[in-house]
């Protein structure tokens, strides 16, 4: 097999391969032998049909399958022999196809990681906002918890709706004089506030009394989930049936105990737990921002091309992550009818930065001969278990496979490279 590699760009190679006639012949022999055992031809027992007969009926199909197999096998061999850091499947163009007694020739264009020689990554100057937890931030978290436990209770001694109230309503609606799906309902709770009724707001109830009916025209947005309602305007009749307000529980030991947090029985204990959690969060925030600043500073001194396939893959991962987060909230991302092209365009800059950073850190780790030991892997597994609150044995099991283990090693190498940048940098607080 003859292999020729041309550099198209820093992130693309053209690989031209010529396959020996003998190898082509052997692959054809194997393909026809397999076909003979599988195919049923009139007048011949399985495995006994002459090759000439098979060629008359199946030549194009067999040669296509053989060409595909030869390309797959020989390209993989070429990548190994030439040590090509391939990042995506090749685009193949066959020059001379499969033919008895002749070599097969094809070319493959493929994206590769750029060869980097990182420079000026020591002595970076960055600014770091130190982690800080104040009494005010602890109180703000307590208020969030208090608000999350608020309940709607009936308004007493008042019958007129005020902005911010929650109203129990009956409603009926029409479009062009005809009812539509979901136009009639009873006992619906909405907020007396600005905004569309489709989002649970009816500002027109402000100043109305229980038993009053208001009429309003409600336009549906052009991207409404119900295609039949998009861009239409509904005439709605809304009757106020009852008024409620959100009532938050008192900030006391009873609230702390109701949360059911292990070891938290009093308000003081809850404050202590909140402060501890905020300190951990702030530490992670400060570390993350420092890492981002170090990577951006290093990238500013190292310009290089990035394989488009890696950027697209990073965008795919981001969208998959968003879908998983929505799914945990019971929302199917597909049902939101989002503009995927717009979403991908919005994520492209972030993905490009992520890929460039990862490639540069990998190159720095190579330049500094960073190694990952078994002790490093064990320590990282323990850290993950502690952070996620999972048993160590479960984390070890999940990271035992070849791919998972390799991903873990790459993450540790990246962290070690970042530590090198940090230790050699000038960091201003």
Curated annotation (Swiss-Prot):
Q: What class of enzyme is it?
A: isomerase
Q: Which InterPro entries match?
A: PPIase_dom_sf, PPIase_FKBP_dom, Trig_fac, Trigger_fac_C, Trigger_fac_C_sf, Trigger_fac_ribosome-bd_bac, Trigger_fac_ribosome-bd_sf, Trigger_fact/SurA_dom_sf
Keywords annotated in UniProt: Cell cycle, Cell division, Chaperone, Cytoplasm, Isomerase, Rotamase
Mind listing the GO molecular function terms for this protein?
peptidyl-prolyl cis-trans isomerase activity; protein folding chaperone; ribosome binding
Q: Which residues form the PPIase FKBP-type domain?
A: 164-249
| Enzyme nomenclature, EC number | 5.2.1.8
Q: Its Gene Ontology biological processes?
A: 'de novo' cotranslational protein folding; cell division; chaperone-mediated protein folding; protein transport; protein unfolding
In its keyword annotation, does this UniProt entry include Cytoplasm? yes
Q: What is known of its domains?
A: Consists of 3 domains; the N-terminus binds the ribosome, the middle domain has PPIase activity, while the C-terminus has intrinsic chaperone activity on its own.
**HAMAP family (UniProt xref):** Trigger_factor_Tig
Function, in words: Involved in protein export. Acts as a chaperone by maintaining the newly synthesized protein in an open conformation. Functions as a peptidyl-prolyl cis-trans isomerase.
Protein name, entry field: Trigger factor
What gene does the UniProt entry assign to this protein? tig
